[in-house]
Amino acid sequence: RNRPSKKLFDLVYKKLKKKKLKRLLNNSSRFFSLNVGKEIHQLIKKKEKLILFKSKKDVNKHFGWDNNKPIVLILAHVFTEGNLSHSWNLFHNNFDWLEETIKKIKKIKSVNWIIKPHPSEHIYKSKVMTLDIYNKLVNDELNIKLFPSSHDIQDFDKFISAVITSSGTAGHEYPMKSIPTIICGESNYSGFGFTLEPKSKKEYFYMLKKINKIKKLDKETIKRCFAYNYLNKYVALEKIPLLYDTNITMQFE
């Protein structure tokens, strides 16, 4: 679904000249903010006034965290969506992925972990929510917190060292900001060289254990991500004027 061919990707990647890349990097904050959370979901809550974290110090103060530890963002999924649409995944479904991930990070104290529920959980009305899994598994682990619903995810990329997603859109968004992103299953953007893709659970859990050692992405890797986003935004997707523009709630007026 909307996955560009490797041949087309390689063509765009090679054509992306250094001057163009420099301009993209200089405008990466704007390009990033235009894309993160703009798929369909956050648009629903657009009218709500949300709080922005001002700094990493502000984040750590909010959660009572140590300023010296890196922050890793884990982006949860809707557990009833996208479980059978990939050719490979390290886990049976997104529910298992989150549960097993939390069980592992409970033992990793060198990192502050923040889990963000999917913004459209309440629309799908799943019987199990991210909060349920969090409450079941997280006890007195002070370095594992839920992202507060009162706050906006925009600009949070400035305060984190890495991102983890099963196979969500974050995998082609955060690498634009040189943030290493681990994915656990096939996606439209997997295999193009800008995400970390463990081949087994053992390798994935090892990455989690060593995640505080992961370095920022280099310019060539970021370039690969921009090449994909160019294809995704301007080539692969085409608006059809006859279709009504709406959001996932499907509430027509």
Question: Which functions belong to the PLM regions below?
Answer:
Residues I71-L73, V111-I114, K145, S161-I164, ...:
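Beta-sheet entry/capping signal
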Residues I144-P148, T195-M207:
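Short acidic-hydrophobic, aromatic-tinged amphipathic segments that line or gate anion-handling sites
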Residues S149-L196:
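A donor-sugar binding/catalytic signature common to diverse glycosyltransferases
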Residues F79-L84, S120-K125, I153-F156, G171-E173, ...:
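Flexible loop/turn segments at secondary-structure boundaries
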Residues L131-P148:
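Nucleotide-activated donor-binding/catalytic signature segment of Leloir-type glycosyltransferases, i.e.
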Residues L8-K69, K202-E253:
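C-terminal amphipathic helix plus adjacent low-complexity
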Residues L34-N135:
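Conserved catalytic-core segment of nucleotide-activated headgroup transferases in glycan assembly
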Residues R1:
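Conserved nucleotide-sugar donor-interacting segment of glycosyltransferase catalytic cores
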